[in-house]
Amino acid sequence: MLWNLRCWKLTILVCGLSAAQSLISFGPMNLSAEEPTGELAQRLSKLEVTQYAPAPGYSEGPTWRQGEVFFCSGALLRVGRDRKVTKYLDLSPAGTFLRENGDILVCDNKNRALLNVGSDGVVSVIAEKYGDKPLNSLNDLTVDAKGNVYWTDPSGSSAQKPVGSIFRVTPTGQVDRVAGNLAFPNGLDVDPSGKNLYVIESQTQRILRYELPANAEPLGTPIPFFHLGGAGGDGCAFDAEGNLWVADFHRQETSKGRITVVNPAGKAVAYLNIPSKVVSNVTFGGPEHNEIYCTTGEPPGVFQAKVGVKGFRGHPARELRMLRKLGIRPEM
């Protein structure tokens, strides 16, 4: 999956916007080109963003835990409190999610499985099949208020061939395909209210909003929420006020990536420019949970900014059924 993802991103940078953008009806999304002017916009425009740690290659899926940052770059890597980068697990991960108990959920494409990396070092499989078929490609993930885990599968999809999917596993282990016909579904997150799932559909440069069902049903028809433009978005994270912070992958007008902050009404309220050509994902962290950590591609690594905005800590992934232990341990 990571290879496919990198190929898509290289295509975006070389060829520009997808021609399919003109075929998409964006409905009620805010398409205003006006620059945000509020207090947050002014503050972020002056904020210093620094490289927190380098990486050996293209980086994805950051998670902050007790002073350490975990991210994906050929393996699951860890940035210690001394900012030294080491390999934590020999996986092929694309996304991570911190559980309230300190465990980390991982979308792993080496084992084609959703994994739980325990704070005690035990690695367990949560999901590896859909029906009688192995999982295909796991990209990014999130958790809803009921403890269901959602992940995107963009494999083989494009604007011309929208075959991407969203999957869900319940706390009891039931795996379902809950949405399809997507043009490269990428980052996703559940808002603080627990009522809505937001998904970045990268190859249409838009963010979609799904109302979460009351029961174990598939997702309904999505509502177009925001049009990013540029090369489309990648990963995202909510702050405590319900604003969505989006890794706005690459902006042709600046030849850099940025974080775009979108309020609950679907309006861009601030931008944070990142000193890298591409920005892949973002998470909140720090002792006060008011810093952001974003992963990048050129140069590869983790960048940090003290934004002074409290991040939403995510809904708790309660007791999850573990299928089996994987038999590997972190490289401590």
Predicted regions and their residues:
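Beta-rich, blade/repeat-based domains predominating
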Residues: 52-67, 72-74, 90-108, 113, ...
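Short loop/turn segments immediately following beta-strands, especially the blade-tip
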Residues: 210-217, 306-313
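A short beta-strand motif characteristic of beta-propeller blades
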Residues: 48-53, 83-89, 124-131, 174-180, ...
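A short helix->beta-strand "capping" segment at the edge of beta-propeller domains
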Residues: 35-56, 222
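A short loop-to-beta-strand structural motif that recurs across blades of beta-propeller domains
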Residues: 75-77, 113-115, 165-167, 206-208, ...
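A detector of repeated loop/turn-to-beta-strand junctions in beta-rich toroidal repeat architectures
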Residues: 111, 161-163, 204, 219, ...
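Glycine/small-residue-rich hydrophobic helix-like segments
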Residues: 212-280
